[in-house]
């Protein structure tokens, strides 16, 4: 079922993810939501958002991957995450009523009522040399 949905929409939501009511994806191509992600109520995501894992822990004795560990972020209620944002890690929580700007890369928690964005310089435009 997940593969059919991904093929038709370009959205990849692991069936183990927990998603609250009022969840909305706008222009969903490229959205990835990992297995242990927890999403609160009234959360809105835009295209290309990743709610992913930093790593998949291995058992030191056997080298086998260990299941049952929280690897993906928590997104509390009333959060908007704009296009291209990547939020990683099982201990990462996005506090309620926050906004995550486009192309932001987060691996740490932010408090409620936060706005996170990249502060980038303006693009430089140069004349192209004639040949």
Regions found by a protein language model. Give the residues of each.
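Intrinsically disordered, low-complexity Ser/Thr- and acidic-rich flexible linkers and loops
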Residues: 60-67, 83
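A contiguous, basic/glycine-rich beta-loop/short-helix subdomain that forms a polymer-engagement track
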Residues: 57
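Left-handed beta-helix
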Residues: 9, 14-15, 20-21, 26-35, ...
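Terminal amphipathic alpha-helical/low-complexity segments used for targeting or macromolecular assembly
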Residues: 1-9, 130-131
């Amino acid at each position: 079922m997940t593969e059919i949905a991904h093929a038709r929409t370009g959205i990849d939501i692991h069936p183990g993810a927990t998603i609250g009511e009022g969840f909305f994806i706008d222009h969903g191509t490229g959205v990835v939501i990992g297995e242990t992600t927890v999403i609160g109520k009234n959360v809105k995501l835009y295209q290309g958002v990743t709610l992913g894992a930093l790593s998949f822990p291995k058992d030191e004795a056997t080298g086998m991957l260990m299941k049952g560990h929280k690897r993906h972020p928590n997104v509390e209620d009333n959060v908007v995450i704009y296009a291209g944002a990547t939020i990683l890690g099982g201990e990462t929580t996005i506090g309620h009523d926050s906004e995550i700007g486009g192309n932001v890369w987060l691996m740490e928690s932010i408090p409620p009522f936060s706005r996170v964005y990249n502060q980038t310089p303006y693009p430089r435009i140069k004349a192209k040399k004639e040949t």
